[in-house]
Amino acid sequence: METEMIRVAGAQPGGEWRFSVLDRACLNMVIKGMWLFHGRLDAAAMKESFARLLGYYPHLCGRVMRGEAVACDNSGVPFAVDEAPRCRLEQAVLMPDAPKRFGAHFDLSGFKRGRQAPLSVRLTRLADGTVLSLHGAHGCMDGDAFYTLVENWGRLHRGEPVVQPVADQSLLPQPATLSAGE
């Protein structure tokens, strides 16, 4: 299996993504998704569209700092490409261990210590299809944001406009600004 760090294409991000109270409560959770495709996806094209996608989500290619925020430093997201040429799509669908066998690797402890990105991707090319797996830190995105990210990736890959993610954290109160009664 070959793993490459994918970084934001174009302008380099900066700043930090601060964890809200709710984000902190979700730091021990991982959101996982897996998609099956007929036909073999082009790994190079998927990486290229993913790099463009990260421009909309720069915090996902950063690293946690002091457990309070993600530094948007463009360290990159691990993107693994694997081959399973003897496995057919119809076999993969029936495998009880498919999520483990084809799932992206995500080290939750490494993420919380700033050694892993908040997101990881694995693309496994089968004999007649492809399995795409994403694992992400729930503290950096909720379910809606996770699935919107995947939808936006598909849109970018097909050359369509994306659904602009909401990233204005000023709307959320930070723990330091809350009074004891709140």
State where each predicted segment sits.
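Non-catalytic N-terminal regions of enzymes
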Residues: 1-182
